Amino acid sequence: AGKQALPDGNGGYRIIDYTAGVVTSPMTSGSVVKGASMLVAYNQGAIKIGEYQQDECIKLAGTKQKCSWKTLGRINDIDALALSSNVYQFKAAMKVAGYQYHYNMPFKVDKSTFDIYRNTFQEFGLGVQTGIDLPVESKGTSSDNTAGGLLLDFVMGQYDTYTPMQLSQYISTIANRGTRYQPHLLKEVHKATDDNSLGEVIYTFEANALNKVNTKEEYLDRVREGFHAVTTKSYGLGRNYIDASHDPSGKTGTSQSFTDSDGDGKIDTPTVSTAFIGYAPTDSPK
């Protein structure tokens, strides 16, 4: 929305214009990234299309339990996206890292496993600049800490940060069946005139395809099917975000972070952010 809420000094907030933040202010985005996480798992052979997993709280050595927002039971890949299962992604990530989950097991990964995920995320525009025609753009933030538990945070969108523009490019790439396009503000340039009329067009910005996501078409179609279930199935967590008559697809997300709530310069107040990305109609996005 290009707006920012700031403390007003009286316990409330004031809203200011923050259009630049769309491309300069990355944040943890939550479960909206699970489409890309699922695609990595398909690519690496960690899961198969239609595979079922038990959604249950997991426990790794030396850590607290990690769970989904509720225990979802036995679910497949479509259900995992529609119901936003964390545990399905956790178990897939463990397999990508070469582990089969069992209770209280040690879980250590190295940079190469993070790279597998980040390389695919970048093909969607997450973790790289989108290429928008503006002089300044953030590519988001990431850390070199490769603790195993942080990989599990990563796959559910609670580790690396992304800008709203990057998330827009990511969902557009899914809508475009794997082709990532450069976003742009410029439409065309007209020749100068001596009056107030538009001169002849001397330059038109043409669609610029940046890359194609390296995956099988059937895998991307499966992610698209999962995103469609999010917004159209009776159990989908995004079914109330867009009128079903538009035949939408999308993904919800919730992330936990910290903010400076009292203006003291300390980012120390826990906060929860919600996100939704989507497109419609599903088979011919507008």
Describe the predicted segments one by one.
Residues 1-31, 36-286:
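Beta-lactam-recognizing serine transpeptidase/beta-lactamase-like catalytic domain environment
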